[in-house]
């Protein structure tokens, strides 16, 4: 929600844009997917600390050294690439693969649905 992101970053702090949304909207059965080239952005660290404290599930996509995100995500998908463009392309491909997996999983179960 771009309006919510603008409001939080302008009125509170850009460092809190993801954490405040996770606090309000995440449930125990949710999985938060985090994407960061360095893995060290303060807003990524803040939401990851919150999720780990609340035992919420996280998947981190990172590049370069992976940083905090690679070390503290429940599942870390790290591409040791030192180029932003290539790293972002790899993350896009991995996200497409993940979304295809989720979409196919939705077709084969009567359990809770994953909403895309």
Question: Language-model segments: which ranges?
Answer:
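Catalytic core of pol beta-like nucleotidyltransferases
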Residues: 116
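Glycine-rich phosphate-binding loops that contact phosphosugars or nucleotide phosphates
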Residues: 1-113
């Amino acid at each position: 929600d771009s309006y919510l992101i603008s409001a939080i970053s302008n009125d509170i702090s850009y460092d809190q844009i993801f954490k405040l949304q996770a606090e309000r909207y995440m449930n125990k059965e949710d999985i938060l997917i985090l994407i960061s080239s360095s893995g060290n952005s303060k807003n990524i660290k803040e939401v990851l600390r919150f999720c780990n404290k609340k035992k919420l599930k996280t998947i981190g996509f990172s590049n370069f050294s992976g940083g905090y995100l690679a070390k503290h995500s429940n599942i870390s998908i790290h591409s040791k690439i030192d180029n932003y463009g290539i790293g972002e392309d790899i993350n896009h491909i991995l996200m497409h693969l993940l979304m295809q997996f989720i979409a196919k999983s939705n077709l084969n179960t009567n359990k809770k649905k994953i909403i895309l």
